[in-house]
């Protein structure tokens, strides 16, 4: 079978029909049980050979959303889904450098790792807010990953950064929610 690296990079994926049907059934169960606003797949479904299965999932999800009268989105790494979904870039450095015609997002950890480790170095609220604003100005978004401890608690230093971001959003939310990219990135009044 394929190596883990091949699966993660989308070069190959498990082709066992039983596995694929179970994956689809589990996704459908999550959709029905929780009515998520967004389905986000980190990796593992990038292979073009899985397109028929991914189309079945997308149809199921979007049809359910129509029944709920609710807008929803699909997001995946790379180009696992076709145009119309939200492309996800891991970490800010991989984000588009110019305005795009499609929506996208960056999944960015609050610290230097996605998971919790003792002594985790975290970003300041200013650094995170700058990334958020930068992404919005190019038609993107920021999916901020927090790093809770094994017992589920969020360390105080991360909580403080989240509170600071929340305070900034309370004051400046109008400049974030419902906005869109300008015609030329970096152009316009400051």
Regions from the PLM with identified roles:
Residues 1-190:
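Mature catalytic domains of secreted/periplasmic carbohydrate-active enzymes
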């Amino acid at each position: 079978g394929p190596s883990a690296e091949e699966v993660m990079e989308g070069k190959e994926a498990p082709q066992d029909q039983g596995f694929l049907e179970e994956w689809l059934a589990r996704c459908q169960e999550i959709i029905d049980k929780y009515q998520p606003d967004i389905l986000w797949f980190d990796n593992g479904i990038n292979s073009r050979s899985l397109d028929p299965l991914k189309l079945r999932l997308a149809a199921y999800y979007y049809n359910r959303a129509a029944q709920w009268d609710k807008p929803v989105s699909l997001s995946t790494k790379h180009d696992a889904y076709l145009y119309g979904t939200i492309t996800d870039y891991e970490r800010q450095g991989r984000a588009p450098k110019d305005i795009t015609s499609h929506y996208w997002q960056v999944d960015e950890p609050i610290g230097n790792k996605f998971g919790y480790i003792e002594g985790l170095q975290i970003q300041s609220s200013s650094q995170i807010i700058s990334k958020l604003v930068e992404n919005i100005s190019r038609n993107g978004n920021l999916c901020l990953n927090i790093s809770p401890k094994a017992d589920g608690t969020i360390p105080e230093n991360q909580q403080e950064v989240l509170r600071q971001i929340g305070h900034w959003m309370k004051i400046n939310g109008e400049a974030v929610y419902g906005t869109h990219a300008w015609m030329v990135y970096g152009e316009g009044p400051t």
